[in-house]
Amino acid sequence: MIDMGGASVQIAFEMPKTEDFVSKDVFEINLGPDGSQNDFNYKIYSTTFLGYGANEGLKKYEASLVSRGESEDSCAPKGLSKTIGDVSVKARLFLKTLNFHRMKFQGSGQWDKCLTRLSSLIDDKTEPACSEQTCFLGYVPAPTFNLSTVQLYGFSEYWYTTSSFGAGGEYDFEKFTSEVRKFCGKDWVDIQVSRIRLFKMYFGFFF
């Protein structure tokens, strides 16, 4: 399973019995009736990524905009203006600066540019370099087997976000990307109108 909250991201999955990866994030549990049957023995990898939750991720992104001194926000809808200034200590350390001032930004709704910007924030330079062959996010030691062979279930923000774009259920990258790209190309005024219409429909359902 993978779970995204406001401050962190968690992941937990069963490792293959042939995987010999050793770490403080690996736990062995036995679900047998008396804990002695090997058929019920499971090796679980579980870790958390502090600072990669939805809220902290947004703060890091906004801090990067402020540090660059840019007025365009490619991740915000066209027509949306917002003021950014106060960011978390974690975000400031991530960007290696403590000097911030309030700035006003204008959304441009550019999906590809937004994706590039967000991807550049994944590598946390405040964490020590990882010495293992495989590492999550560049600094968390991880097993070497292909994670795409693991069936993962997304919770919290993963579910909320995909469901909001009609892409819930089994994850389909192409479908989800297509829906988000279309949404990002909309004007803020149109998004607000759609939200009001949806609220009225939802409210009318009960009355």
Which role fits each region the language model picked out?
Residues M1, V9-F207:
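Helical "lid/coupling" subdomains associated with nucleotide-phosphate turnover
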